């Protein structure tokens, strides 16, 4: 029985791995990174590693299953790109939810992702994650959550966290309309591979 369970687990792991192909180490364009049966769903250009050469962040989508892969590639001075980061869906499609991703952008050397995530029965969460390439990886330097009412689409609360300065700002936009700010201790910045939208959360009062 134990052997059967172990075999089933290996088979399941192999199936998951097969569903998330490994992207090539280098390519001429985002489309050239795409395996057969995949297409470019979203792409952004900009300098992410401060070498004055445009890099790309792109999302590939499977033509049949709709599964997604996030790729980040650094541009080469003589054309083409070198793959720096690949996410097989854990971040870009948390728990298989491809509807969560809204958009992404590259600004001032940082990579920003916006998600619309299910919250409580009355609210949705507009979550934004900001990463910077440092220490040879993409580290989370900022996070923001807007608590949005399902009833009238109004943003009632905003929590903004700056991990670089270790500062958090909480804004209540209801009738009392107040803003609070404080510093907090944070030992180690998380990498992109350690963050799962919907699971990641920070509470002002608990910092």
What are the functions of these language-model segments?
Residues 50-60, 107-115:
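Acidic/hydrophobic-patterned starts of short beta strands in beta-sheet-rich repeat architectures
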Residues 22, 109-207:
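Acidic, small-residue rich beta-repeat scaffolds with periodic aromatic anchors
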Residues 13-15:
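N-terminal signal peptide c-region/cleavage motif recognized by signal peptidases
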Residues 53-56, 67-69, 99, 123-128:
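Short, surface-exposed coil-to-beta transition loops
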Residues 23, 67-86, 131-135:
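Beta-propeller blade repeat segments, especially FG-GAP/WD-type strand-to-loop junctions
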Residues 19-36, 78-98, 207:
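Blade-edge motifs of beta-propeller repeat domains
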Residues 39-48, 99-110:
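Beta-propeller blade termini
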Residues 62-65, 119-121:
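Short glycine/acidic-enriched loop and turn motifs that connect beta-strands
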């Amino acid at each position: 029985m134990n052997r059967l369970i172990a075999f089933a687990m290996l088979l399941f792991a192999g199936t998951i791995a097969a569903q998330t192909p490994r992207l090539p180490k280098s390519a001429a364009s985002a489309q050239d990174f795409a395996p057969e049966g995949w297409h470019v769903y979203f792409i952004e250009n900009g300098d992410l590693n401060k070498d004055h050469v445009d890099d790309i962040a792109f999302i590939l989508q499977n033509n049949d299953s709709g599964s997604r892969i996030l790729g980040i590639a650094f541009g080469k001075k003589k054309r083409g790109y070198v793959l720096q980061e690949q996410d097989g869906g854990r971040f870009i499609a948390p728990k298989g939810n491809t509807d969560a991703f809204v958009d992404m952008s590259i600004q001032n050397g940082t990579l920003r992702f916006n998600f619309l995530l299910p919250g409580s029965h009355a609210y949705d969460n507009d979550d934004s994650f900001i990463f910077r390439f440092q220490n040879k990886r993409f580290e989370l330097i900022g996070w923001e959550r807007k608590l949005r009412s399902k009833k009238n689409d109004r943003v009632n609360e905003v929590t903004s966290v700056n991990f670089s300065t270790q500062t958090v700002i909480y804004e209540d936009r209801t009738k009392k309309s107040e803003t609070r700010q404080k510093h907090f201790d944070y030992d180690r910045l998380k990498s992109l591979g350690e963050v799962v939208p919907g699971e990641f959360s920070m509470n002002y009062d608990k910092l």
